[in-house]
Amino acid sequence: MLQLLGLSTAVFATRTQAAVRPSRSATAGPLAAFPTTGRPFEPLLGPIPLPSDGLDASAQRSVYGRVNLRDDMVVPRGYRSDVLLQWGDPLGSARFGFNNDYLAFTSLEGGRALLTVNFEYISPRPWCAGYKEVMGRELPFARLKELLASRGGSVNALVLEMDDPLRQPLLAVASAALEDVGIGVAEITLEQQGWQRRSGRFDRRLSGLTGLSRPQEQLRSTGPAAAVFRRRQRLGYDDGLSDRVIGTFANCAGGQTPWGTVLSAEENFQTHVVEPVYADGSSPPPAQRPFHFDGERLEGLGNPFGLSGNKYGWVVEIDPRRPERTAVKHTALGRFRHEAVAVRARAGEPLVLYSGCDRHGGHLYRYVSEAVVRDPGDQANSRLLERGRLEVARFQPDGSGRWIPLQPQTPVEPLLPSHFEAFELPAVLPVPHSDRSQAGAELLRSDAHQRDYRQRFRTLADLYPGSGEEQLGAILIDAHLAANAAGATPTARPEDTELDPRTGDLLITFTAGGSDGEGQADPAIFRGPAGETSWPYGWLMRLQDDGAGNPEPGGTFRWRLVATGGTPWQGGMGFANPDNLAVDRAGNVWMVTDRASVNGSADVFGNNSCWLFPAAGPAAGEPLLFATGPMECELTGPCFDQSESTLFLSVQHPGEDNATHQQGQEEIQAYSLMDRDGGRFEQLRLVPLGSNWPAGRAGQIPRPGVVAIRRQDGAPLLMR
């Protein structure tokens, strides 16, 4: 636990806490929370026994024998949770979007503030079920589904004739979906009863279609890839926009800069546009990512509008205090499935950013600016995001590591397939296709294949021919495959990156090990408590960047895994699939989880949740359950107001699997658990299907939203 707090490098002994809030029976109310034992609040009880729950084995078997999950935002005794914003609320000239994720708090004068909010993606079931009620107009979902089914479920919308009966319903649904994602800025005010939503002049929406009908609102792009966008001769598709971009979507997490801007991370863009690129960085045509809708999946939203895939998957900078300022995609930071951004800005040093690529086998990246920071608060620092060096992490099993620059002269030396085979795992090593007239990847199947590949391509320049910014831009557009070719470590879905203000360490959440056919986490680095090579419950890592103050190419770092997900009887700490982080001024680490709603063995952990790792006191380093979310949702985007008396959280996709909960729509699940003495016992769990949050009444549609959590007495969030 001391390692988690950055206080020791000794071997970390995993301990555990909880994940959801149980009740004494399938119909009873919630249990009282843990007795206070010097903890900063009374932690919630979860659905599984924990060493820290204060119960002996007999009591654990009694308490956890029958449990019901709650379709509610549950917080500890003495706290309250208030809905601040929800899907469909007016926001500027538009609406508060769907599936809000990352939140950034910007203080203004006079008790006013701004919340910058990401709207990540569309969950078709609850979105279709609630759209008419929320937006006040109907979309032709049934007609679209019927027409598409007759054509195999997918279509290249760009070739539809004007009088095709499919065209209008398709454009109506695709437009509405892209308008419901992107970024928003909402003004709030501090009243006696806490933070309240108040419309203001800073209210703003960017969507997936911003700039389509009003070209003056198109996003700018900076950095080397902008040179690729401007090329007139290319191997692939030309959208005719040069270095301008239509909209932003797949906005997951992000980061804030000391000069007042917000960085929004485009993550799973591959759902809607073509991800692979040619050797020159250009994209295949949108026809390769056709539009699809069947009521369960909604994909290829970029296809009807001819969006070029190489313009998505970037970090977007927005100034919430200047709505007239154009949003910018900074391509020097690389194109991959960005989850979040951590920013280190110190006077006299280069600007350093850290970001993870959230995919199985994704990498951890570091960006180092070419020039140095003069004043961290100077708005001119945005220019430091335009020229710099993108690097990718290579981890070693001994706890060391180094940064590999993604530059033309970087040697091609991908991992050997035998590295994975030694752990009895199949190698999933995609690298840029050896036929450089083709877009995308090929898999290295054997060590001999790897050696032949290296003989043919000595450096990244051999894979990405050209010169100058255009060559570097192509590498950055294809950052994930270029990183694989350069020998970066494939990791376990790296999600959030946050800097510890006390130690300077980088905190990284890795959501899950294993493979999905696209990539495989390195089993020499990411192992379960008993050495498992495909551990699905995730980790929290601390990374000490040795040259953070003066980062050189090929610099080194030290790393250690300091918290492991999983059940206590498996050696885990009681949570599953860590996702977003927030670190308060006292160094307490707040963490939310991203357990898929239907995830096999992970279902034992119940609803997704928010945890606290205290930095000091009797519970230092111990995960304490602070909140659980409604049914089938994630809690995301934790952030604080300036006094740290309010925690803001996004409640994303409630009812994602079953949409609206109806009276009596529950199922009973059975689990085999283990008490503190190692005795097995059975649990029956009542699980509502679907959600009615935030209305709280059966039959009411679920709506994603933002909550403000504070103490009922108005004191700081944590007791000192």
Where are the regions that the model predicts?
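Glycine-rich phosphate-binding loop of nucleotide-binding enzymes
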Residues: 1
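Conserved small-residue
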Residues: 4-720
